[in-house]
Amino acid sequence: MRIIAGKHKGRKLYDFNGDKIRPTSDKAREALFAILYNVNGLSFLDLCCGTGAIGLEAESRGAIVTMVDLSKESVALTKKNANQISSQAEIICSDAIKFLKTTNKTFDIIFSDPPYEIDLGQEIINIVEQRNLLNKNGIIIYEKDKSVDYSTEKIIKTKEKKYGKNIFGFYMVKYE
């Protein structure tokens, strides 16, 4: 696992031993950031960050990053990876839903990749909508192992991309 582009391009990241965490593959991460294109200066939330690879990739490309995970092991590994590249990212040990319900921040990009067996998609989209956590023209990306649609009255799915076992659903606020 490595940083693909930006100021930390090529830097290797630590990974978990075993199969506790399912990090997004380098190939899927590269495809995701090709779609996002330019994240420089954008506020980026990585929910259920696991190893921190997505958030650190975003930071390497110039984003202002917040990473959240409930697992103390994940947070420790994310901090280890962040320290390796002198990251300025904010790393928080918290339940994703609790974080969304209590944060005072808003974001340009919210990336969420909870364990596939835990389906938080609808709840995350609902809270983001209710609390107006997405900045104008912001985007939510929800990673899953199957096609799902968590659209609401105000936040709609705009596209879906599949990379191997990874399916990214892209959501935006619907403006009248």
Stretch-by-stretch model annotation:
Residues M1-E176:
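Class I S-adenosyl-L-methionine-dependent methyltransferase catalytic core
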